[in-house]
């Protein structure tokens, strides 16, 4: 029996090598059950033999029973050993399962740690890049700080430059000045608002732009003027994000920041993005400041200008009218800022062919400027020139001629005193030369009839354009000698003005190359205004620059070519 059992065990051991773990566990359980049964059976037999042994006397038969009992005991010991080994195998199997499970958990953890390690490496690389960019930005800001400190030291020098050059410098800043309610935007009209009156308008609304935003605004001007939009845009976005975290979205400072970012987008010709930001800013300002606040008027005007740039004059007109209503209500109907808004509205109507309304708005603006700023204010000449261009488009040549002559006469009187027989404006010299053509020699000096213009420094770009337009009008009337006189005066004055500007800028470069480079960058950036031909002062902003070629249709032209009526955003040099 024992031999057979051993054989079975060996057979089982041979088969174990080919069994799976689950099969081994199952077979082991069966073996345990079999061994338990054998153990119980052997115990029963042993008990029976022991009972029999008690009843027998000591003889040969009792010895046989005792020998059988000993064999049964040995078998029980082997069964106990087999059971113990089987239980050890079961415990070992459970342990192996636990180890395998733990191994799988550790493998999953290793994979997760590898992924986290890779993520941390990527984050570290990104952080290092951001740190490098931040260090570069810090270095740039340090340079910008030094530059601004230097510019502040030159403030007295800047205050001493000519009035017309001041206007040109202001015009280069205008695209970003419109973001604040104290300089409500009018790119394209070029009617600059004085800071004192603008600040008063802002205070009337009970909201004042924080100094930190003005500093940021100036910094954005510098970056945008250099074409460094990759710096200006993130700077605006970061400031906007910080403001929204600290003050919430519906806060006037957030609206101001939205306006700044909108203008940067506008300079990049991203008109759709700019319009979305301006609409958001408008909603915030109406909610926080009220619908009749000057800042609301500024935002409405900015939005109207933006629509105008996209050719959406019909959509822009009601916005411009609402801005006009607010300014009339807050500032009064005869305030210069109202005239500025009237100029914008006139330009929108002119692009839609509403000439009666254009005349009304320009005439009203002209009356305000003459009353409040005086007849010698540059805005008076500019508005007259705009009104004259409107007359030209309608074929009202006589009215346009009258306005052109008024501009030239006033410019002459401002420089040389009242007009008399010995002191005549250039258009009178031109008409006299036309009447006396053939009698006057070709070698007549320019100074005899046009030298007065060389000293005209007040608003020479407007005068230059007026000379050209009146010359074109003379040419249409067949007054070729008079036309040539005015055109020659304009050409020579322009050349002299450019020479003066060149000399001045050479001197500036020698004194401060960095400042001059910055000035050039600002001038090249300013695509948001339309300028007349540049004069000695570098040019002044106006709502439109129109030269008429004297054709029968009365079409506007520039340098003999057809010029489209432009919304502010294009510049003629």
Swiss-Prot record:
Recorded consequence of changing residue 460 to D: Mimics CLSTN1, leading to decreased interaction with CLSTN1
Protein function: Kinesin is a microtubule-associated force-producing protein that may play a role in organelle transport. The light chain may function in coupling of cargo to the heavy chain or in the modulation of its ATPase activity.
Extent of the TPR repeats: 213-246, 255-288, 297-330, 339-372, 381-414, 464-497
Subcellular location: Cell projection, Growth cone; Cytoplasmic vesicle; Cytoplasm, Cytoskeleton
Consequence when changing residue 521 to A/D: No effect on motor function
Classification lineage: Eukaryota, Metazoa, Chordata, Craniata, Vertebrata
Bias type Basic and acidic residues, positions: 155-176
GO cellular component term of the entry, any: cytoplasm
Region Disordered, annotated ranges: 155-203, 553-573
Ranges of biased composition (kind: Low complexity): 188-203
Protein name as annotated: Kinesin light chain 1
PANTHER family in alphabetical order: KINESIN LIGHT CHAIN, KINESIN LIGHT CHAIN 1
Coiled-coil parts of chain: 27-156
Top-level taxon: Eukaryota
PROSITE patterns: KINESIN_LIGHT, TPR, TPR_REGION
